[in-house]
Regions:
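Hydrophobic faces of well-ordered beta-strands that scaffold small-molecule active sites
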Residues: 17-19, 64-68, 97-99, 140
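Preference for extracellular/luminal or secreted protein segments
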Residues: 48-49, 58, 78-239
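Short, well-ordered coil/turn segments that N-cap beta-strands
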Residues: 8, 13-15, 60-65, 94-95, ...
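Active-site mouth loops of central-metabolism enzymes
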Residues: 1, 72-81
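Histidine/acidic residue-rich metal-binding segments in metalloenzymes
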Residues: 2-8, 54
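Alpha-helix-loop-beta-strand connector modules within alpha/beta enzyme cores
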Residues: 41-67
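Short, active-site-adjacent cap segments at secondary-structure transitions
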Residues: 23-27, 73-76, 211-213
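Short acidic, glycine-rich surface-loop motifs adjacent to enzyme active sites
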Residues: 9-43, 70
């Protein structure tokens, strides 16, 4: 049953699927020695050839692009070094590596260079086959061709166009439409949803981590700008 949504999406031609950094011992219980911890570590789905290559690309017939979730997440970063993590993900069948390192400054580029050098070295040593890289490139280029972005044209993707489009009122309206369409209400007792806010009513918004308050406030302000929240509404942050 867990695979059913993926089967439906694949049959309908979905082009990209993102892996999760979860352990799924029923599908893959293999381990690898971490260069960071020195211990035998179980492979998460992002590093599992059994899940990505054998199951997803093989048995389920997915011909699109497999991208990892952010590799700087603690589930990966606390257990594996950056170079080894990327190599294991590519070897497992990942075609795109999301955030293999964090680039805060020009000095951080050296970390990206080390990752690229590590992958190149792994190919030379036969740890990663050229056919694996060819497969990933083919999948990426196929999606770009299907989307009409195989050839970059400055006139179509200019900085001025980006500045006038990204974050515009129309752009954010489209974001809200996509977000609303992506939500499926499974249970709605007493017709709680949609929430109808009355005058002077208080609404509690929670976020799991302290560093997410800024995003919550940003979302609140954008909703207010769009007229989704009354101008007279106020927000108070409680820590």
């Amino acid at each position: 049953n867990e695979l059913k949504p993926y089967k439906i999406a694949i049959n309908q031609g979905i082009e990209m699927i993102m892996t999760a950094h979860i352990l799924y011992p029923q599908l893959d219980n293999t381990t690898v020695v971490s260069e960071k911890t020195g211990n035998e570590e179980k492979k998460p789905a992002t590093m599992s050839k059994a899940i990505i290559t054998d199951l997803l690309k093989g048995e389920m017939g997915f011909n699109g692009v497999v991208t990892t979730d952010a590799m700087n997440m603690k589930a990966i970063a606390d257990t594996f070094g950056q170079v080894q993590a990327v190599k294991l993900a590519i070897e497992a069948g990942a075609d795109l590596i999301c955030m293999p390192t964090v680039l805060y400054s020009l000095d951080d580029v050296k970390n990206l260079d080390a990752i690229i050098d590590g992958v190149e070295d792994a190919v030379k040593k036969g740890e990663i086959s050229e056919s694996r890289l060819d497969d990933g490139c083919r999948r990426i280029l196929t999606v770009k061709e299907n989307r009409g972005i195989l050839d970059w044209k400055e006139s179509d993707f200019s900085l001025n166009k980006a500045l006038s489009t990204v974050g515009s009122a129309n752009n954010r309206a489209t974001e809200r439409e996509i977000s609303a369409a992506a939500v499926t209400v499974v249970k709605n007792e007493n017709n709680t949803l949609p929430v109808v806010v009355k005058e002077n009513q208080k609404i509690l918004m929670l976020c799991p981590y302290d560093n997410e308050r800024a995003q919550m406030i940003m979302g609140y302000n954008r909703a207010k700008e769009a007229g989704l929240i009354p101008e007279s509404a106020e927000v108070k942050v409680v820590r």
